[in-house]
Amino acid sequence: MNLNSIPAFDDNYIWVLNDEAGRCLIVDPGDAEPVLNAITANNWQPEAIFLTHHHHDHVGGVKELVEKFPQIVVYGPQETQDKGTTQVVKDGETAFVLGHEFSVITTPGHTLGHICYFSKPYLFCGDTLFSGGCGRLFEGTALQMYQSLKKLSALPDDTLVCCAHEYTLSNMKFALSIFPHDLSINDYYRKVKELRAKNQITLPVILKNERQINVFLRTEDIDLINGINEETLLQQPEERFAWLRSKKDRF
């Protein structure tokens, strides 16, 4: 399968997987127009849509795409049932698309019903995990998001993390404020800065590398523990995650 990214709005990415026959899967189409343009340019035949959560910048293009291609099956969590979903899926279930099984992983935090889709090596994680960061807590709790990230971090090393937003540069600036002397973070920040200066995408990322540079995946890191404890005593990793998320919100 071939992985494609379609820019939308200011910083969204709509991901598309296509097979050799031209059949395609569309993930979180917040806007129909760029997707329709890509379908025409590549002669794709849409088979399915995956929705991760109910926010408009992830579901706004569904209605128009389904009107144009009524054969499309729209998979999504319960919270997207009124956004065009025709097949509600939940944790532990699978969606069989393009000849591949995609596992559904529930990841509450950004929204209460947020889900991700995984078929090795592809992880479509919506607004749960970003490169260098994680989603804001609009509906869920810090504990829920911490547990969701633990699930995703446990996936295979070679997982390709397909995030829904180009937030990497700002996330890495925050990471540097936490770990100013970390070699991996400094190296990745320089790489990302160069890519964005050329208006190039920083995604997808390999999960093995992401674990090294994403402070939200490093809540049990001794350097982080020592650094945080200079300000406040936090004994549990989920407490350190909540502290980081709150600090990032104000960054």
Curated annotation (Swiss-Prot):
Catalytic activity as recorded in UniProt: an S-(2-hydroxyacyl)glutathione + H2O = a 2-hydroxy carboxylate + glutathione + H(+)
Top enzyme category: hydrolase
Which residues are noted in the entry as Zn(2+) 1-binding?
53, 55, 110, 127
What keywords does the record list, in alphabetical order? Answer: Hydrolase, Metal-binding, Zinc
Keyword Metal-binding assigned? yes
UniProt key word Metal-binding: yes
**InterPro entries listed in its UniProt record:** Clx_II_MBL (IPR035680), Glyoxalase_II_hydrolase (IPR050110), HAGH_C (IPR032282), Hydroxyacylglutathione_Hdrlase (IPR017782), Metallo-B-lactamas (IPR001279), RibonucZ/Hydroxyglut_hydro (IPR036866)
Pathway terms, separated by semicolons? Secondary metabolite metabolism; methylglyoxal degradation; (R)-lactate from methylglyoxal: step 2/2
Q: Which superkingdom is the protein from?
A: Bacteria
User: Which residues does the record give as Zn(2+) 2 binding sites?
Assistant: 57-58, 127, 165
What does the record give as EC number? 3.1.2.6
Which molecular-function annotation in GO is an example for this chain? metal ion binding
Q: How is the cofactor bound?
A: Binds 2 Zn(2+) ions per subunit.
The cofactors required by this protein are:
Zn(2+)
Q: Which CDD domains match?
A: hydroxyacylglutathione_hydrolase_MBL-fold (cd07723)
Q: Name one Pfam family in it.
A: Lactamase_B
Q: Name one GO biological process term.
A: methylglyoxal catabolic process to D-lactate via S-lactoyl-glutathione
Q: Describe its function.
A: Thiolesterase that catalyzes the hydrolysis of S-D-lactoyl-glutathione to form glutathione and D-lactic acid.
Q: How does it assemble?
A: Monomer.
Q: Which family does it belong to?
A: Belongs to the metallo-beta-lactamase superfamily. Glyoxalase II family.
Name the chain's protein: Hydroxyacylglutathione hydrolase
Please report the organism this UniProt entry assigns to the protein: Shigella flexneri
Q: What is the lineage of its organism?
A: Bacteria, Pseudomonadati, Pseudomonadota, Gammaproteobacteria, Enterobacterales
